[in-house]
From Swiss-Prot:
Lineage: Eukaryota, Viridiplantae, Streptophyta, Embryophyta, Tracheophyta
Principal localisation: membrane
Cellular compartment(s): Cell membrane
Signal peptide: 1-27
Name of this protein: Receptor-like protein 56
Family stated for the protein in its record: Belongs to the RLP family.
Organism listed in the record: Arabidopsis thaliana (Mouse-ear cress)
Length: 947
C-alpha cells in the first residue's frame, strides 16, 4: 500500500514537473503579440524591406517561443521579457515612437532602441508619464537617433533608471538637468556626441546623487563651466570631457580633488601647460587620456604614485626636447602606453639599463626620434600591439619581438631607416605587419608566407626589395591587404599566389618591374575589390582572369604595355567605380556602353573612331586625352554627373555642341589641341565651374566595401581603445590639367572631397580653329581658376566682363586676332599669376598696377600697337608718331583744297571769256558777221569730211 502511495506521489511529482517545464516552453502571449506589433512598426519605416528579412526569427508561428527570438532576453522562471533590442541594419525612415508599444513589457530591465532613426516620443493617453509603466527599467539606450531636448520630460518618469545613454543625438543648448531631477537612481549618464553648448550647470548635478559615470565628450563649445561644482560629485568614478572647447583657463586642480576618479578622459580640450603634479594623488585612477592637447614639459615624478594606472595616453601634444619615461618605472599595472608627437620635436630618452616593472599589452612610441629599439622591450612578453613608426631606427627589423611575444598581433615599423629584413625562426600568428617607407633592400624572403601565414594586413611598400614575388605568399590564406608597391620586384606572379589567396581584398603592386601577361587564366581572387598594378612591364591583352573579378571597385593598370581592344565586359562590372588604363598601347573603338559611376582614365592610348553618344553614362571624371579619336563631340545622352571632361589631343572636328552647356556640375573642361571650329557657345556660363550650390557639388567617393581591420585592446566605461586600419586613405584621384603654362597634378581623395582637385575649376579650348568673338558670358564664371583660349582665330575685343573672374590664376588669350585695348578693369584680378595676350592685334596702353606689375614683356609680344611697361615702346613716342601722322593728313587736306580752287577758277575764266565774246557780238555787227562766217565754214568742212 505504501509502495502504491509512494508511486502515486512520484507520478504526481512527474506530472507537476512536466507541467512546470511546459510553462517554460513559451513566452507570455501578450508580450509575443507586442513584439510582433513592434516589428510592424519597424517594417512600416522600411520601404525596401521584406517581412522575413527584418528580425526574421520574430514570426507569427504560435509555437515559436519569443524568448528564443533574436535581440530578446527573458527571465528563466517567469518567462517575462527582461531585455529588448530593436537594432536592425536596414535604413529606416525617421519617425516618432509611440511609447504605448512598450507598455506590455512590464518586467523589462534593458531597452536598446539605438540606431533606430527615432526623432521623438509620444503617448496620447499617458503623455509624459508613459515610461512609469516600465517600473523595472534600469538600462535605456537611445543612442544614435535623432532625438532632441523634447524627450527629457518623458525620460523623467523612468525613475528606476540606472543607465541612460543619449549619445549621438540632436540635443542642443545647455544641459537640462532639472528635467531629469526624478532620476535619483541614475548612475551612468552619456550625453556625448550632441550639440550641447553654453554653460554647464554643474550646480544641478546634485539632483543625480548616485551618479558614478558622466560622459559629455564631443559636444561643442562650453562658454562657461562651473568647474568648482565638479568637486561636489563625490561619487563620480568616470568622467569624460574629451573633444570640447572651453573658454578660459582650465583649473586642473579641480580634477585632483576628485579622489574617487577611476577613469578621466580629457582628450582635445585645449589643455595648455605642464602635466599637473597633483594627478599623482589620484591613486584609484586606472584610465587617463590627455592626448591631443598642448601639454609641455615632462612626466612629473608624482606619476609614480598612480599604482592603479592601466592606461596612459599622452599622444599629440606639444612636448619638446628630451622626454623621460622613468616616472613610469614602478607602475606595475600599466598595460597601455601611447605617446607620439605632432611634429617630431620630441626625443624620448630611454636608458639602456631601464627595466620597468610593468608588462605592457600596447606600446605606441610614434614620431619620438628614436634611433634604436628601446632595450626594455627585450623584457616585455605580453605585447599585443607595438607601433614604432616615424622614428629613425636603423639596422635589422626586430623580428625577435615576435619570438618574445607569442600573442603579438600588430607590428608597425613604417617610416624608419631599417635596412635588413630578417625572418623569424618559427611560425608566428602576427596579423598586421607594416614595414613600409624604409630602406630595406635585397631579395624578398622566400619563406615569408610560410612563417607568417596568418597575416591579414601586410605593407612593405616604398623599399628596395628585388627579385621575384615569393610563391610562399600563396600560403597566407587570411591575407586581406597586401601592398608591395614602389619596390624593384620583377618576374611574373606565381600561380600558387593567384590561385590560393581567396581572402585578398586589396592588392597593390604598382611601380615595380613585374612582367608577362597578367592573369591570363581564371583566379581565386574572388574577394578582390582593389587592384593596382600600374607602372610595371605587363604586356599582352587584358587577361581572361581579370574579367572574372566581378566585385572590383578600383582597377588601375595604367602605364604598362597592354595592347589590343578594350573588352566591353570590363566597363559593365556592377561595382567598378574607378578604372585607369591610361598609358598603354590599347587600340580599337570605344565601347558603346559604360556603367562606371565615377572615374574612367583612358588617356595616352591609341583608341580610334568616334566617341559614342552613350559613352558617358554616370561617369564623373572622363579622360580620353591624347588618343586618335575623330568625328564630332557627341550629343551625350543620359548623363547628369560629369564634372571633368578631358578630350585634349585628339582629332575631333565640327562645332562645340551646345548640349555641353547642360553639364551643370562641370569643374574641368579640356577640349584643346583638336580641330574644332565655329563659335564658342555663349551658354557656357550655364556650366557651374564651382558655382553649384554646396549640396550639388560632387563628392568623389569610391565605395569600397572592405571593413577596416579592428582590434580592441582596452575598454573603459565610455572609451573603447582599439587598433584600426582605415583603407580609404589609399585611394586618390590624380588629374593633370594645363594651367600657369605647365601641367599640374590635382589630387582628390575619394571619400572626403579633400585635396587640390576639389578646388580646381578650368576651361581649356586652346589650339583649335575657333572663330568669332569671345562671349561676354564667360565672365560670369567667376570661380574659374584657369582659362585658355589661345591658338585660335578669335576676333573682336577682350570682354570687360573678364574683370569678374575674381579667382582666375591663369588667363591665356595669345595667338588670336583680338583687337582694341586691354581692359583696365583686369587689374582688379588679384589672383592672376599668368596673363598672356601675345600675338594679337591689340593696341593702346598696357594697364599697370597690382598683378599687372608682375608680368614681363613676353605676355605682350606680337602686338606692335601696345605701349608702356613692360615693353620698350614708350607711349610718348607713340603719341608723337600719331601727331606726325595727323600732320600729314592736314597737308593732304590743304592740297585737296588747292586743287578745288584751281578747278573752280579755270571754269570761271572760261565762262567769263565766253560771256565777253557774246557781248562783243551783240554790240559790234562786223564781229557778229565774222563769227557767223567762221561757224558756217566749220560746218561745211565737217560735212565734206563726213561725205
Amino acid at each position: 500500500m505504501e509502495g502504491k502511495v509512494f508511486s502515486g506521489q512520484k507520478l504526481i511529482l512527474v506530472m507537476l514537473l512536466l507541467g512546470h517545464l511546459h510553462g517554460f516552453s513559451s513566452c507570455i502571449e501578450k508580450e509575443r503579440k507586442a513584439l510582433l506589433e513592434l516589428k510592424k512598426f519597424v517594417m512600416s519605416r522600411c520601404e525596401e524591406c521584406e517581412y522575413d528579412s527584418v528580425l526574421p526569427t520574430w514570426t507569427n508561428d504560435t509555437k515559436s517561443d519569443c524568448c528564443q527570438w533574436e535581440n530578446i532576453k527573458c527571465n528563466r522562471t517567469s518567462r517575462r521579457l527582461t531585455g529588448l533590442s530593436l537594432y536592425t541594419s536596414y535604413y529606416l525612415e525617421i519617425s516618432l515612437l509611440n511609447l504605448s508599444l512598450l507598455h506590455p513589457f512590464e518586467e523589462v530591465r534593458s531597452l536598446d532602441l539605438s540606431n533606430s532613426r527615432l526623432n521623438g516620443l509620444v503617448d496620447d493617453v499617458e503623455g509624459y508619464k508613459s515610461l512609469r509603466r516600465l517600473r523595472n527599467l534600469q538600462i535605456l539606450n537611445f543612442s544614435s537617433n535623432e532625438f532632441n531636448n523634447s524627450i527629457f520630460p518623458f525620460l523623467n518618469a523612468a525613475t528606476s533608471l540606472t543607465t541612460l545613454s543619449l549619445r549621438r543625438n540632436n540635443m542642443y543648448g545647455p544641459i537640462p538637468l532639472k528635467e531629469l531631477k526624478n532620476l535619483t537612481n541614475l548612475e551612468l549618464l552619456d550625453l556625448s556626441g550632441n550639440r550641447i553648448d553654453g554653460s554647464m550647470p554643474v550646480r544641478e548635478f546634485p539632483y543625480l546623487k548616485k551618479l558614478k559615470a558622466l560622459d559629455l565628450s564631443s559636444n561643442g563649445i562650453y562658454s562657461s563651466m562651473e568647474w568648482q561644482g565638479l568637486k561636489n560629485l563625490t561619487n563620480l568614478e568616470v568622467l569624460s570631457l574629451g573633444y570640447n572647447y572651453f573658454d578660459g583657463p582650465i583649473p586642473i586642480e579641480v580634477f585632483c580633488e576628485m579622489k574617487n576618479l577611476q577613469e578621466l578622459d580629457l582628450r582635445g580640450i585645449n589643455f595648455v601647460g605642464q602635466l599637473p603634479l597633483c594627478f599623482g594623488n589620484l591613486n584609484k585612477l586606472r584610465f587617463l587620456d590627455l592626448s591631443s592637447n598642448q601639454l609641455t614639459g615632462n612626466i612629473p615624478p608624482s606619476f609614480s604614485s598612480l599604482e592603479s594606472l592601466e592606461y596612459l595616453s599622452l599622444s599629440d601634444n606639444s612636448f619638446e626636447g628630451f622626454f623621460s619615461l622613468n616616472p613610469l618605472t614602478n607602475l606595475t599595472k600599466l598595460k597601455v602606453f601611447i605617446f607620439s608627437s605632432k611634429d617630431d620635436m620630441v626625443q624620448v630618452k630611454i636608458e639602456s639599463t631601464w627595466q620597468p616593472l610593468f608588462q605592457l599589452s600596447v606600446l605606441v612610441l610614434r614620431l619620438c626620434s628614436l634611433e634604436k629599439i628601446p632595450n626594455f622591450l627585450m623584457y616585455q612578453k605580453n605585447l599585443h600591439v607595438v607601433d614604432l613608426s616615424g622614428n629613425r631606427i636603423s639596422g635589422i627589423i626586430p623580428t625577435w619581438l615576435l619570438e618574445n611575444n607569442p600573442e603579438l598581433e600588430v607590428l608597425q615599423l613604417k617610416n624608419n631607416s631599417f635596412t635588413i629584413f630578417q625572418m623569424p625562426t618559427s611560425v608566428h600568428n602576427l596579423q598586421v605587419l607594416d614595414f613600409s617607407e624604409n630602406n630595406i633592400g635585397g631579395l624578398f624572403p622566400d619563406n615569408f608566407g610560410r612563417v607568417l601565414p596568418n597575416l591579414v594586413h601586410m605593407n612593405g611598400s616604398n623599399n628596395g626589395f628585388q627579385g621575384n614575388f615569393p610563391s610562399s605568399m600563396g600560403e597566407m590564406y587570411n591575407i586581406s591587404f597586401l601592398d608591395l608597391s614602389y619596390n624593384n620586384l620583377s618576374g611574373e606572379l606565381p600561380q600558387s599566389f593567384v590561385s590560393s589567396c581567396f581572402s585578398l581584398s586589396i592588392l597593390q603592386l604598382s611601380h615595380n618591374k613585374f612582367s608577362g601577361h597578367f592573369l591570363p587564366r581564371q583566379t581565386n581572387f574572388t574577394s578582390l575589390i582593389v587592384l593596382r598594378i600600374n607602372n610595371n612591364l605587363f604586356t599582352g591583352k587584358i587577361g581572361v582572369g581579370l574579367l572574372t573579378l566581378v566585385d572590383l571597385c578600383i582597377l588601375d593598370m595604367s602605364n604598362n604595355f597592354l595592347e589590343g581592344e578594350l573588352p566591353p565586359l570590363l566597363l559593365v562590372f556592377e561595382y567598378l567605380n574607378f578604372l585607369d588604363l591610361s598609358g598603354n598601347l590599347l587600340s580599337g573603338a570605344l565601347p558603346s556602353h559604360v556603367s562606371l559611376d565615377n572615374v574612367l582614365f583612358l588617356h595616352n592610348n591609341n583608341f580610334t573612331g568616334p566617341i559614342p553618344d552613350t559613352f558617358l553614362g554616370s561617369i564623373q571624371i572622363l579622360d580620353l586625352r591624347n588618343n586618335k579619336l575623330s568625328g564630332n563631340i557627341p550629343q551625350f545622352v543620359d548623363t547628369q554627373d560629369i564634372s571633368f571632361l578631358l578630350l585634349r589631343g585628339n582629332s575631333l572636328t565640327g562645332y562645340i555642341p551646345s548640349t555641353l552647356c547642360e553639364f551643370s556640375k562641370m569643374r574641368l573642361l579640356d577640349l584643346s589641341d583638336n580641330k574644332l571650329n565655329g563659335f564658342i557657345p555663349s551658354c557656357f556660363n550655364n556650366l557651374s565651374f564651382g558655382l553649384a550650390r554646396k549640396e550639388e557639388i560632387t563628392n568623389y567617393y569610391v565605395a569600397v566595401a572592405l571593413e577596416s581591420f579592428y582590434l580592441g585592446f582596452y575598454k573603459s566605461t565610455f572609451v573603447v581603445e582599439n587598433f584600426r586600419l582605415d583603407y580609404s586613405n589609399y585611394f586618390e584621384i590624380d588629374v593633370k590639367f594645363a594651367t600657369k603654362q605647365r601641367y599640374d597634378s590635382y589630387i582628390g581623395a575619394f571619400q572626403f572631397s579633400e585635396g587640390t582637385l576639389n578646388s580646381m575649376y578650368g576651361l581649356d579650348l586652346s589650339s583649335n580653329e575657333l572663330s568669332g568673338v569671345i562671349p561676354a558670358e564667360l565672365g560670369d564664371l567667376f570661380k574659374l581658376r584657369a582659362l585658355n583660349l589661345s591658338h585660335n582665330f578669335l576676333s573682336s575685343h577682350i570682354p570687360d566682363s573678364f574683370s569678374k573672374l575674381q579667382d582666375i590664376e591663369s588667363l591665356d588669350l595669345s595667338y588670336n586676332m583680338l583687337q582694341g585695348s586691354i581692359p583696365h578693369q583686369l587689374t582688379n584680378l588679384t589672383s592672376l599669376a599668368i596673363f598672356n595676350v601675345s600675338y594679337n592685334n591689340l593696341s593702346g596702353i598696357i594697364p599697370q598696377g597690382k598683378q599687372f606689375n608682375t608680368f614681363d614683356e613676353n605676355s605682350y609680344l606680337g602686338n606692335p600697337l601696345l605701349c608702356g611697361p613692360p615693353t620698350d615702346t614708350s607711349c610718348e613716342t607713340k603719341k608723337n608718331s600719331e601727331e606726325n601722322a595727323n600732320g600729314g593728313e592736314e597737308d593732304d587736306k590743304e592740297v585737296a583744297i588747292d586743287m578745288l580752287v584751281f578747278y573752280w577758277s579755270t571754269a570761271g575764266t572760261y565762262v567769263t571769256a565766253l560771256i565777253g565774246i557774246l557781248v562783243l557780238m551783240c554790240v559790234d555787227c562786223s564781229w557778229r558777221r565774222a563769227w557767223l562766217r567762221l561757224v558756217d565754214a566749220f560746218i561745211a568742212s565737217a560735212k565734206s569730211k563726213l561725205a
